[in-house]
Amino acid sequence: MAQRDEPFAVFVFGMRLNSVRGLPRWLWGLRVLRAVEADLRAHPERGFLAGRVYRTGRTLVAVQYWASFETLDAWARDHALPHRPSWQRYLREALADPSVGLWHETYLAAPGTWEGVYMNMPPWGLGAGADLIEMQATKGSARARLREQRKRSSRPPETP
């Protein structure tokens, strides 16, 4: 079971190939995404906890876990980091050609408002970036586990 007694942020984003003429830009985006994730993993001090990229058909989806919204926001705004020039290039090109779509969602999670349960799994999802604890048989329901999380931390969720 994943345990994190501090609020954190979940950043979900993706890229969709809307037209075959956008394939070169979509493939370029995939290369950029891999490079950005490698850079984030090399610099955990930036607040990146864990993440994974998925491909389904013509859509890429990335799920990232961050130490806080502030660390995610600071990373996104830092012009010196590798993702920034790629993002600016994408914005310029997207105005001229909608063949590749981009989207993102940001969620803030406070202790007691989420759970991650992993059985017979390698580190996965938030469990790859949080402390893992053995689930106790006496706390077998989500309700009991979430109640326990809320007891450990009385801080409200952080807001941007």
Q: Where do the PLM segments sit?
A:
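Short S/T/G/P-rich N-terminal loop/turn motif that feeds into the first structured element of a domain
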Residues: 1-56, 74, 98-160
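A short, glycine/Asx- and small/polar-enriched loop/turn
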Residues: 58-60
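Tryptophan-centric aromatic hotspots in well-structured domains and transmembrane helices
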Residues: 65-67
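An amphipathic, aromatic/His-enriched active-site/gating alpha helix that lines ligand/cofactor pockets
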Residues: 69-101
